[in-house]
């Protein structure tokens, strides 16, 4: 009787193991088939956003904001419809081979939940929660708004109304979902993005030295030509794009193993630094400066400091190459302002070079790569392994010290030489000092409910017109429709909930990316893009031209981290 019970138990275990085996097969087959379908749809959208969207123009710069918004809106809506259709195909069990209830390549019926998990993420990240809260804040801001039409369309500002919030929320949910083999597709798509971005950089470079091959500046007042560039319009917006593309290429350069692909990414880095001068926007130095600091820590942690040195050479070579090109060919008459005036201060350039050289020497002295020594005794019966410690903690502390010392040195030099960038007043940062002070005061005057949920989407223009219209024209000569600080912008328009949830989106995405940085070679580039945009957002405007890239890169980052966790 006992023997029979043992046999029964054995059969039961075999049956359970067999069921587990089939369950595993079901997951794999759903992931490999329906996953490919959804990956293809997502890849098509990424190509749309990274190839077509950057180059989209209609009437030169005259309607560029509306044109970009329309292209983005059409792309997201079309993508959402196709994605929903793909999801229906997956859930109904219909595949490319016309089979229903079974997946191509398998004989096992797959449940709806298994199919859904093959497409939608299996787990929630902090960024997902913050993104939901950010969307809710946009809805609440719309409810608080007096002008509902403007709050929905955002036409009074930069088309960042509730409609825009809906679009980025849909894009985030779909792009960050679980898809199979996204890493392989992203490798190809990112290289195409390098080429497209380089085209936009080259257009800006040519315009800066007096050539306008596509006649984009025709009809623009000569006094205003210096603030329009490339296929993005305003120099600050173009600078914002650089803060997305360049850090992405830098991260991919660090982690890429293929020499050919690394050369392509290197070209993107070189061209991106050349575009610093045509952009002529301090936001570029803020975003990319933060990126360089992040790359320093990342390369030390990942034991790839050689790539950091190569990036420094590529970056400095690109910037100096643009300076030389302007000297040889001439310019369009645009004056170099802000941090680009560093070229006029040789002593400060020497300090920067000395800091870079010091970092390199420190790295050379303290880097200890992982080394494993294997000893085998004579009769080969025992093996001894001696693994040396790499001292990563010490190197990170040294890197932090170098960053702090160099930062203090730059500030001291700037203050002693009375550089305008270090003197905060109403004129600071092209009157950002003025608008920040006024917007902060406006927030303090809002009712308590609006302090929490905001005065209304894209409502800065109406608030400033009501209180400071004459003063704005007298002091700055222009009318402001944005706080020129994304965090202050969301604080006033979407309240404390909107500002904190936006900070949460950026912060949790960065934390997640740091934790998973070694899980995928594509995480670092996306992480750097989010960091760079988050820093430049302190000095720039949220708008429908480059702000979508921030949420796209965040969605891609979370999607990659999600996939890395599952693997």
Language model features: what each stretch is:
Residues 391-413:
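Internal/C-terminal transmembrane anchor helices
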Residues 234, 431-479, 494-498:
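TM-adjacent membrane-interface loops and short helices in multi-pass inner/ER membrane proteins
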Residues 2-3, 9, 25-37, 41-56, ...:
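Alpha-helical transmembrane segments of multi-pass inner-membrane proteins
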Residues 48-61, 80-166, 199:
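N-terminal hydrophobic segments of proteins, predominantly signal-anchor/transmembrane helices
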Residues 155-159, 203-218, 408-459:
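Aromatic-rich transmembrane-lumenal/periplasmic boundary elements in polytopic membrane proteins
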Residues 2-35, 93-125, 366-393:
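Membrane-interfacial, low-structure loops and terminal tails that flank and connect transmembrane helices
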Residues 225, 436, 453-456, 480-488, ...:
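Alpha-helical membrane-protein architecture signal
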Residues 61-67, 152-157, 235-236, 280-287, ...:
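Membrane-interface catalytic loops of GT-C/OST-like multi-pass glycosylation enzymes that act
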């Amino acid at each position: 009787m006992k023997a029979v019970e043992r046999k029964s138990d054995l059969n039961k275990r075999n049956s359970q193991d067999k069921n587990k085996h089939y369950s595993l097969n079901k997951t794999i087959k759903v992931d490999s088939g329906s996953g490919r379908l959804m990956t293809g749809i997502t890849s098509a959208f990424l190509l749309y956003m990274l190839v077509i969207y950057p180059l989209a123009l209609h009437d030169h710069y005259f309607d560029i904001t509306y044109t970009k918004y329309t292209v983005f809106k059409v792309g997201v809506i079309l993508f959402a419809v196709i994605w929903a259709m793909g999801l229906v195909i997956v859930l109904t069990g219909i595949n490319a081979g016309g089979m229903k209830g079974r997946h191509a390549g398998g004989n096992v019926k797959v449940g709806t939940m298994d199919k859904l998990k093959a497409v939608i993420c299996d787990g929630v990240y902090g960024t997902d929660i913050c993104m939901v809260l950010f969307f809710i804040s946009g809805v609440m801001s719309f409810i608080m708004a007096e002008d509902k039409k403007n709050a929905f369309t955002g036409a009074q500002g930069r088309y960042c109304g509730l409609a825009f919030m809906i679009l980025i929320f849909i894009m985030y949910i779909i792009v960050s979902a679980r898809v199979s083999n996204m890493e392989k597709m992203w490798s190809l798509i990112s290289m195409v993005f390098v080429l497209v971005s380089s085209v936009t950089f080259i257009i800006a470079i040519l315009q800066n030295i007096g050539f306008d091959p596509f006649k984009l500046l025709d009809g623009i007042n000569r006094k205003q030509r210096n603030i329009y560039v490339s296929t993005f319009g305003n120099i600050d917006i173009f600078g914002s794009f650089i803060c997305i593309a360049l850090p992405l290429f830098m991260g991919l350069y660090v982690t890429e193993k293929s020499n050919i692909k690394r050369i392509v990414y290197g070209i993107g880095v070189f061209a991106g630094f050349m575009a610093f001068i045509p952009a002529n926007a301090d936001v570029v130095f803020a975003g990319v400066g933060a990126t360089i600091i992040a790359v320093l820590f990342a390369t030390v942690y990942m034991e790839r400091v050689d790539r950091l040195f190569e990036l420094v050479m590529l970056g400095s070579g690109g910037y100096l190459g643009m300076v030389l090109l302007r000297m040889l060919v001439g310019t369009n008459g645009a004056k170099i302002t802000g941090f680009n005036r560093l070229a006029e201060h040789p002593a400060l350039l020497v300090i920067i070079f000395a800091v870079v050289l010091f970092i390199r020497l420190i790295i050379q002295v303290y880097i200890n790569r992982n080394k494993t020594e294997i000893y085998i005794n004579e009769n080969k019966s025992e093996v001894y392994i001696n693994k040396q410690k790499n001292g990563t903690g010490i190197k990170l502390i040294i890197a932090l010290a170098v960053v702090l010392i160099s930062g203090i040195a730059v500030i001291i030099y700037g203050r002693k030489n009375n550089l305008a960038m270090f003197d905060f007043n109403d004129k600071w940062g092209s009157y950002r000092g003025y608008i920040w002070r006024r917007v902060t005061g406006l927030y303090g005057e809002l009712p308590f409910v609006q302090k929490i949920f905001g005065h209304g989407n894209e409502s800065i223009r109406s608030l400033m017109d009501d209180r400071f219209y004459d003063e704005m024209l007298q002091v700055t000569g222009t009318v402001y429709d944005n706080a020129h600080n994304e965090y202050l912008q969301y604080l006033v328009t979407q309240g404390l909930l909107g500002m904190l949830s936006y900070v949460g989106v950026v912060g949790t995405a960065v934390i997640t990316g740091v934790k998973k940085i070694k899980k995928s070679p594509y995480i670092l580039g996306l992480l750097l893009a989010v960091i760079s945009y988050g820093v430049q957002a302190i000095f720039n405007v949220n708008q429908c031209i480059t702000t979508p890239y921030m949420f796209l890169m965040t969605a891609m980052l979370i999607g990659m981290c999600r996939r890395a966790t599952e693997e």
